Design a protein with these regions (language model features):
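Helix C-cap/helix->beta junction micro-motif
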Residues: 71, 192, 251-252, 286
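Amphipathic alpha-helical segments in well-structured domains
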Residues: 58-61, 150, 178, 182, ...
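Hydrophobic/aromatic ligand-binding patch that stacks against planar heteroaromatic rings
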Residues: 67, 248, 282-283
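Active-site mouth of glycoside hydrolases
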Residues: 1-222, 234
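Residue-level marker of positions within ordered structural domains that often coincide
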Residues: 158, 170, 230, 288, ...
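Active-site clefts of carbohydrate-active enzymes
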Residues: 171-172, 202-205, 209, 221-278, ...
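Short glycine/serine/threonine/alanine-rich loop segments
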Residues: 20, 73, 254, 288-289
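Aromatic- and carboxylate-lined catalytic core of secreted/periplasmic carbohydrate-active enzymes
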Residues: 256, 263-266, 272-329
Length: 329
């Protein structure tokens, strides 16, 4: 949703032509390569006003929803991303973030409970932004702005029927946070007579780990499950862990989505293009309802190799609908 007009439209057309019909859309809160913008209005003094919107941000989001709907492309939104709220990487995203009390006119550090610097990896869970809900620390100051953002997002997205909702990107935060926002989104949707599909994406690479039980064990809150982190593995281990998740869910079956397949030459994870190709097919043949290559350099994106895999998968599915068969081992 952060790109200017022509670049994403060309990519969506390329995706649809290859037989693809699913994209990932994090509601990015970081400046990337000069084209990304924030959802809030910026004042002449350089500070943000969290009570005023940046219209361009929301116009881009609306365009994404409109153009993907025209092409029958499913949009999986990620509402929050912990990496946007940290200074751990060289980009130091938190230093420029509108929620940083140094960067807005709406609250101070003492009023919000937010520091102006968070140098640790977000996996250490030292960012109070993700502890605001009533069954956590109930930070009313921050929660009001978070709710306002989600309400604005839903104002746009609930007008469409091709949107899935994921609370976070690869989090290891508290279950109470995910449960609150899943319930919040569902209630807002029902107020508009809409039904929504919601999940959470946990960071644990082990699908049999306790984190994933937080979604697996709560079908009343989570309509599908996210298994992207399984693709950090490869070969038999990747296959076996996906099979274990599928078996665990068999009592109350729900779709398993893989919105990020890792693996590309030059990846920070030391992976290869071949690993990405194999990972895509393992997830697809193992029962994933949706499979998408992660962006470069962590994945193959929508390059020629990815397009070839999409076309092959579509041809296979035309001959043997994959939902009509089961893995044999």
């Amino acid at each position: 949703s952060q790109w200017s007009e022509q670049a994403p439209i060309a990519q969506w057309a390329r995706l649809a032509a290859a037989g693809g019909n699913s994209i990932r859309t994090p509601m990015r809160d970081r400046r990337l390569e000069g084209f990304a913008i924030y959802p809030y209005a910026r004042r002449p003094d350089g500070r943000y006003d969290l009570n005023r919107w940046n219209d361009e941000y929301w116009q881009r989001f609306e365009r994404l929803l409109r153009e993907t709907a025209r092409r029958n492309i499913v949009v999986q939104i990620e509402v929050w991303d912990r990496f946007d709220f940290t200074d751990h990487t060289s980009e130091k995203h938190w230093q420029a973030h509108p929620y940083n009390p140094a960067n807005n006119v709406n609250y101070t550090a003492s009023q919000s409970g937010l520091a102006v610097l968070y140098p640790d990896h977000p996996g250490l869970n030292r960012q109070p932004f993700f502890f605001t809900t009533p069954h956590q620390r109930h930070n009313r100051t921050l929660l009001a702005y978070q709710q306002r953002f989600v309400d604005k997002l839903l104002e746009h997205s609930l007008g469409y029927d091709h949107v899935l909702y994921c609370i976070d990107n690869e989090t290891n935060g508290e279950a109470a946070w995910a449960h609150y926002w899943a319930d919040y989104i569902r209630k807002r949707a029902r107020q508009r007579d809409r039904e929504v599909q919601v999940t959470e994406m946990w960071g644990d690479w082990r699908l049999t780990g306790a984190e994933h039980r937080r979604t697996f064990d709560h079908p009343e809150l989570f309509d599908f499950v996210e298994v992207s982190q399984n693709t950090h593995k490869s070969g038999q281990r990747q296959w076996d862990d996906l099979a274990a998740a599928r078996a665990y869910l068999s009592g109350q079956p729900r779709p398993m989505n893989t919105v990020k397949v890792y693996g590309a030459d030059g990846s920070d994870f030391g992976q290869t293009d071949q690993k990405g190709i194999e990972g895509f097919w393992i997830q697809l043949l193992g029962g994933s309802a949706a499979v998408r290559f992660h962006r470069p350099d962590a994945g193959l994106g929508l390059g020629d190799t990815a397009v070839a895999s999409l076309r092959a998968a579509r041809k296979l599915n035309e001959r043997v609908p994959l939902w009509s068969v089961q893995p044999a081992n």
